From Swiss-Prot:
Its cofactor is [4Fe-4S] cluster. Homodimer. Protochlorophyllide reductase is composed of three subunits; ChlL, ChlN and ChlB. Pathway: Porphyrin-containing compound metabolism; chlorophyll biosynthesis (light-independent). Belongs to the NifH/BchL/ChlL family. Its EC number is 1.3.7.7. Residues 275-295 are annotated as: Disordered. The gene is chlL. Binds 1 [4Fe-4S] cluster per dimer. It catalyses: chlorophyllide a + oxidized 2[4Fe-4S]-[ferredoxin] + 2 ADP + 2 phosphate = protochlorophyllide a + reduced 2[4Fe-4S]-[ferredoxin] + 2 ATP + 2 H2O. The lineage of its organism: Eukaryota, Viridiplantae, Streptophyta, Embryophyta, Bryophyta. It is found in: Plastid, Chloroplast. Mg(2+) binds at S14. It comes from Physcomitrium patens (Spreading-leaved earth moss). Residues 275-289 have a biased composition (Basic and acidic residues). InterPro entries: NifH/chlL_CS (IPR030655), NifH/frxC (IPR000392), P-loop_NTPase (IPR027417), Protochlorophyllide_ATP-bd (IPR005971). This is Light-independent protochlorophyllide reductase iron-sulfur ATP-binding protein.
């Protein structure tokens, strides 16, 4: 099974991807995580350092694929998850999609691409040009990481459009949304109402999730010294279980940009006053109770 993880830049895709990868490994699966970002930091919390990229290695070997060995590009991460960083072209030059293609090509040459139960592509930001949509060509499922904010959901909608486009020619489905580090989910629910799709999980606003990135550790590794964080790992295990159940998934129908802009803007401009609603409900209950006469 191949999974592509997308979402707005800075939303926590890599942190989420690494924890999902370990959760899948904990379920007995052989997992490979491929970072598809020129920053090559996708697997940082799995390995604890920035591993050399495929492009770095190919350049050292003068692009002689026959001189590259699996151990040159595949690094063992925490929890038995194997890690690869595709890397990228120099800033302002080349195409990231080409790099993803070269990565897959090399892994196939090494007979490594088909050795895994799960391959997870962690893809750069919310860029959905043809190049960075390339991992969708190989994926069975796409997962979108979001939060309860306007920008993240707007990006999610554009990614949903990319999934729909790729699904025309590939057996690709959207597995669903994952809400990351958010104290509320009302805007997520509003979006899902307009663009129906599964919500796999919504992780609460837990500071340790952010801290784990800085420490270069996954939540699963942090639990070894902080058992109180065990409940956080359950969120990722729940996502893993849903993925392993091989959900039917959907081909999403994105909301038109202007319509979505209006929908999300209206939610901010005209928030529901829940306090007022509660007062009105109490008043209603009081009035209703007055209608009864005990005999």
């Amino acid at each position: 099974m191949k999974i592509a993880v997308y979402g707005k830049g800075g939303i926590g895709k890599s942190t989420t991807s690494c924890n999902i990868s370990i959760a899948l490994a904990r379920r007995g699966k052989k997992v490979l995580q491929i970072g598809c970002d020129p920053k090559h930091d996708s697997t940082f919390t799995l390995t604890g350092f920035l591993i050399p990229t495929i492009i770095d290695t190919l350049q050292l070997k003068d692009y002689h694929y026959e001189d590259v060995w699996p151990e040159d590009v595949i690094y063992k991460g925490y929890g038995g998850v194997d890690c690869v960083e595709a890397g990228g072209p120099p800033a302002g030059a080349g195409c990231g999609g080409y790099v993803v293609g070269e990565t897959v090509k090399l892994l196939k040459e090494l007979n490594a691409f088909y050795e895994y139960d799960i391959i997870l592509f962690d893809v750069l930001g919310d860029v959905v040009c043809g190049g960075f949509a390339a991992p969708l060509n190989y994926a069975d499922y796409c997962i979108i990481i979001t939060d309860n904010g306007f920008d993240a959901l707007f990006a999610a909608n554009r990614i949903a459009a990319s999934v729909r486009e790729k699904a025309r020619t590939h057996p690709l489905r959207l597995a669903g949304l994952v809400g990351n580090r958010t104290s509320k989910r009302d805007l997520i629910d509003k979006y899902v109402e307009a663009c129906p799709m599964p919500v796999l999980e919504v992780l609460p606003l837990i500071e340790d999730i952010r801290v784990s990135r800085v420490k270069g550790k996954t939540l699963f590794e942090m639990v070894e010294s902080q058992p109180s964080l065990n409940y956080v790992c359950d969120f990722y295990l729940n996502i893993a279980d849903q993925i392993l159940s091989q959900p039917e998934g959907i081909v999403p129908k994105e909301v038109p940009d202007r319509e979505l802009f209006s929908l999300l803007s209206d939610f901010y401009l005209n928030p529901v006053d829940k306090t007022k609603d509660k007062k009105e409900n109490k008043k209603e209950d009081k009035e209703n109770s007055a209608d009864f006469t005990w005999l």
